[in-house]
Amino acid sequence: MAVTVDLDTDCAQLVLDVGALTLGEKNRKKMKSHHLRKRENENISQAVCTLLNSGGGVIKVQIENEDHNLTRDGLGLDLEASLFQCLPFVNWHLDITEDGGYVYIFVKSWSLDFFGLLIATLRTNLYTRSMSSSVEVNAAAALEFLQDLKETGGRSCVGPELPAQRVCPGVEEESHVEDLATPVFNKTQFQHQEDFPFSRSTFVEATLLSGKQLQKRIKELIPRHLSAFANTDGGYLFIGLDGNEQQIIGFEAERSDLEHLESEIDKCIQQLPVTHFCEEQEKIKYTCKFIPVHRPGAVCSYVCTPRVERFCCDVFSAEPNSWHVEDSCVKRFTTEEWVKSMMDD
């Protein structure tokens, strides 16, 4: 069940209905459906976030298991953890009661003075590269990133020039890794189990996928890694490289499959939410290559390599996980709405 506004309540406060949930640690551990358990946790987190952004209110939870007693059984540790997602000090902002087959969670309004931010957010979905990882930044760091972009009117799509001389001779710099990756990207073919001369870095991500999981995993990897590269200084995602052995393996695919895969990658990139603080309002610039991997006598697999350029402003992997009530409906902030709400003076 989706989180909905209870329009039939006699309560003077805003009431959100999350439907029937299994409550209590023992009963939640017995739940057979992992998907249902995950969905219930997501609904609780979403409801708390929504009320924090809507002046506070009440979450109405129907108790699925009739023998539940709040004092004896509690909510369940996983549901409690879901309450923590928005609220580090739960007891200061929530009160929980049980009455007539329902649990009611009373949520106070969000406070700028207390939290230092204008709205509550479960996930920003804003990634940057940090050394060799794509890292999602928290709301406070996202605000700082956005404020910097606003002050400068965006940023140049060309990264800052690095010193010609290395500070520590013999130490491999991040920029040197990019220099090693570029010739590999420019190749027209590889030999199976050929070595490649670089590791993961700020500019490079390498991963090995099988043909069976290829399309699903690419849809998961593209938004996170390419948005992170775009928000940093650009970079390469090599799909088909064994990072542990530093060998080129590739993934098995028919030639006819590559066109469909390229179309899916393009769709993923075009759907990435962006906001602008610059006049140019440019689109995400990228190049995608499929490079054949040869065994003696035949092509046996392919390496897929999207390369994305540094972006002028900010790229999100998805709309931020933040909700509010509008026109008696629970609505997710669009990226533009979220950015405006975070930065509203």
Each model region followed by its residue ranges:
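Conserved N-terminal catalytic/coupling substructures associated with nucleotide/phosphate chemistry
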Residues: 1-345
